[in-house]
Amino acid sequence: MLARLPAPLHRLVLKVAHSLRLAWWSVRRPELHGCNVIAADPQGRVLLVRHSYQSPEKWMLPGGGMARGERAEDAACRELLEEAGCRLVEAKCFAVEVVGLAGASNHIHLVSGVTAEEPRPDCREILAAEFFAIDALPDAITQTARARIAWWAAQNPAQNRAS
């Protein structure tokens, strides 16, 4: 349904919905489960995205909420396809972080994998999606994304070397 809206109106709806969701979480304080995806291309670069509704000037890892009973790897594959138009293979959950988010307890499942596809963001939810070399991440990246990539890279030195 939202896809029928003009892109600027769609982005406005996403911003309002995100604000309402954060307000609701501050009241309800739910336990949430989501994923962040570290998708590397064959050259070892990682995919980052810029959301239209949350800090659009910042680069972040792709990801999103997990449905009840959904495996982290399946959620990561779904989110990467939705946000960047890329298929993730060799998906593996390598850690779970619990962080506070607007009063909610947010369990972030960190999933890594490989994609050989060029990103195709919809320019609605996702304004941009690009691959970056680990040693040349953009200045405008969130600290959380930078830390998660560094942690993953330290554990997977062979996987993130340029060919």
Task: State where each predicted segment sits.
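Charged phosphate-binding loop/patch that engages nucleotide di/tri-phosphates or the phosphate backbone
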Residues: A150-S163
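Active-site-adjacent beta-strand/loop module that shapes the phosphate/pyrophosphate-binding cleft
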Residues: E97-R120, E130, R148
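Conserved Nudix-box catalytic region and its N-terminal flanking loop in Nudix hydrolases
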Residues: D41, R45-E82
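NUDIX/MutT-family hydrolases
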Residues: P121-A153
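Conserved hydrophobic "DFG−1" position in protein kinase catalytic cores
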Residues: A39-A40, L48, G113, F131
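A short coil-to-beta-strand element that immediately follows conserved catalytic motifs
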Residues: R87-A95
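Acidic, metal-coordinating catalytic segment for phosphate/diphosphate chemistry
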Residues: M1-N36
